[in-house]
C-alpha cells in the first residue's frame, strides 16, 4: 500500500503541473520507503517510467543500504540523485558531512557503474572528488547553484543547505565550470513561508533570479561565454534528464526564454511570482532580465515594460 501511495502522489504532482501548464515537472521517488533510511524493496518493482530516485534533503546514512540501492538502480536503469550530507557529522561539521558522502557515492557509482547525479555541490573537496570520479570513468554528473556561485559566508548569513561556503569554495566551483567538471546549474528553489524561515527552515527562492545571477557572475564578471551558460542551464540539464529540450532544433520542444543582456535591473523580492519572497538577492543589480518565457510554442510569461 505504501508503494501504491507513493506512485499515486508522484502521478498527482505531474498531473497537477500539466493542468497548470507553466512548466514541466518530473517527480522523483525516494530511495528508501517513506525516507526510513533502510527499506529499498520498492526499488525492484518501480514502473519503467521512474528514471530518478533521491532522498531529497537527506543522505542515506547506512552504507550497505546505499550500496544495495546502487546495485538495483544499475539493473533497472535508474539514476541516483544525491544530496550529499552525512547526518551524523553535519551537526558539528557541514563541510566534512558533504565531502565524505560525496566520496562514498562517487565510489559506489564507479563500482556499480550506476548513473549518479550530485545535487547542489558546494565545497572544493566535493567538486574535486567528483572530478576524480569522472577521470576514473564513473558515470557521475553534478550541478551547482546560483547562490553558491554568488555569495560567500562573509557576505551572506542566509540559512540554506548546503550552507553558503567560503570564497575559496566559490572559486573552486567557478574553476570547475570553466574546466567542464560541472554539468549543470540548478536553483534548489525552496519557497518557504516567512513563518517557516523565522523557525529556521533552510532554503531560498531562486528560479526567477537564476539566469540574471549566473549571467552577471559568470559572463559579465568571470568572462565565460554565454554559450557555456546556456549549455549549463538548458542543454545539459535536458540531456541528463532525458528530455527533448535545450535546443532550437526540429524534434525538440519549443521551450525558451527571451532575455535582455544589456540593461541592468534591480531585484525586488516583492515583485517575484513565487509563493514566498525569501530571496537574499533582493536589491542586487543584475544583467540578463528575462523578458518572456515560451513553453511548447506558447507565451507563458511576459515582463512588464
Regions found by a protein language model. Give the residues of each.
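Single conserved hydrophobic/aromatic residue that forms the stacking wall/gate
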Residues: 1-9
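Conserved phosphate-binding/catalytic loop of the ribokinase/pfkB sugar-kinase fold
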Residues: 33-38
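His/Asp/Glu-enriched, well-ordered alpha-helical/loop segment
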Residues: 96-115, 178-179, 183-185, 189-261
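C-terminal cap of metal-dependent C-N hydrolases
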Residues: 253-305
